[in-house]
């Protein structure tokens, strides 16, 4: 973990802990891994294959020599567990987060999504759910997601990260920065 990534994660935690402390967060969705966002963005903007985009990410230093934790979604799942724990004032463990990576996303998938008005982004999604008995639960998951082009997260490019928060009093907020 490099210093810029660690600093970015600390900032995100502080944002959730302090900025929204008095508010009830309903949903947090975000692009929380710069490597996977770079790969998916390169596939969309240049038509590159997954392997070509990964090679470029490695060449530029965005991907590590072993990118498994990034491309399989494990890094994003760890961050989703932290976001859910902080945002919903509960304990969510890494093992509780459903996780799918981007290794099966093809250039054809990207093109079809683009033609339909979507971008594919690896999103960490954490949300408050109401059970039938009236109790609440928190769901956290990471997977490639079709994001409508008009949604702010669709415009997050290269290795940038963004967190989109939906809260009761604050409404919709987006926090954007280097991954």
Language model: regions and residue ranges:
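Single conserved hydrophobic/aromatic residue that forms the stacking wall/gate
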Residues: 1-7, 11
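Conserved phosphate-binding catalytic cores of ATP/NTP-utilizing and phosphoryl-transfer enzymes
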Residues: 12-16
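Conserved anion/nucleotide-ligand pocket segment
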Residues: 17-72, 76-78, 83
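Structured core elements
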Residues: 27, 39, 121-122, 141, ...
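Short beta-strand segments
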Residues: 29-33, 143, 166
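A broadly conserved detector of short glycine/acidic/proline-rich loop/turn motifs that flank catalytic sites
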Residues: 44, 124-126, 146, 169, ...
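Substrate-binding/catalytic subdomain of NAD(P)-dependent oxidoreductase enzymes
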Residues: 53-155, 160-162
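C-terminal helical cap and adjacent loop that interface with cofactors, partners, or active-site loops
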Residues: 157-179
